[in-house]
């Protein structure tokens, strides 16, 4: 139980540190000036690697390009974030896209279809 609380605490601290670095220190053109949200961080049991799940607001560049830029900058992000956290070993960061906008878009399109059908049947 104590380990579970510890993991949650470390995950939260990692999430904050990584978000701060992305916001303030990363100067990559496909990362800066983008709406990037770190939705969650999942640290491995051995504390050697972390899965960082991000949500990227759609922009003129594709989300995949921004994700690729994050993956390319993972070492820099880890180095900068390690300055804020006191950990014996700082984990390797692996970024994954967590698309939270697609379900919303899907629901909105379904509601629009229902509204159109309703107009046709009840003029």
Curated annotation (Swiss-Prot):
GO terms for cellular component: cytosol. Its main location: cytoplasm. Keywords: Cytoplasm, Ribosome biogenesis. One of its GO terms (molecular function) is ribosomal small subunit binding. InterPro entries: KH_dom-like_a/b, RbfA, RbfA_dom_sf. It comes from the Bacteria. GO terms for biological process: maturation of SSU-rRNA. Pfam families: RBFA (PF02033). It is found in: Cytoplasm. One of several proteins that assist in the late maturation steps of the functional core of the 30S ribosomal subunit. Associates with free 30S ribosomal subunits (but not with 30S subunits that are part of 70S ribosomes or polysomes). Required for efficient processing of 16S rRNA. May interact with the 5'-terminal helix region of 16S rRNA. Belongs to the RbfA family. Monomer. Binds 30S ribosomal subunits, but not 50S ribosomal subunits or 70S ribosomes. This is Ribosome-binding factor A. It comes from Chlamydia trachomatis serovar A (strain ATCC VR-571B / DSM 19440 / HAR-13). The lineage of its organism: Bacteria, Pseudomonadati, Chlamydiota, Chlamydiia, Chlamydiales. The gene is rbfA.
């Amino acid at each position: 139980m104590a380990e579970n609380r510890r993991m949650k605490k470390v995950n939260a601290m990692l999430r904050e540190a990584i978000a701060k670095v992305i916001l303030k220190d990363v100067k990559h053109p496909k990362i800066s000036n983008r709406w990037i949200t770190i939705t969650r961080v999942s640290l491995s049991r051995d504390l050697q690697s972390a899965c960082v799940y991000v949500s990227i607001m759609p922009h003129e560049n594709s989300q995949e390009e921004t994700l690729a830029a994050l993956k390319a900058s993972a070492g820099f992000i880890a180095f900068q974030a390690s300055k804020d956290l006191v950990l014996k070993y700082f984990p390797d960061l692996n970024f994954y896209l967590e698309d939270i906008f697609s379900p919303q878009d899907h629901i909105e399109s379904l509601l629009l279809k229902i509204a159109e059908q309703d107009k046709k049947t009840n003029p």
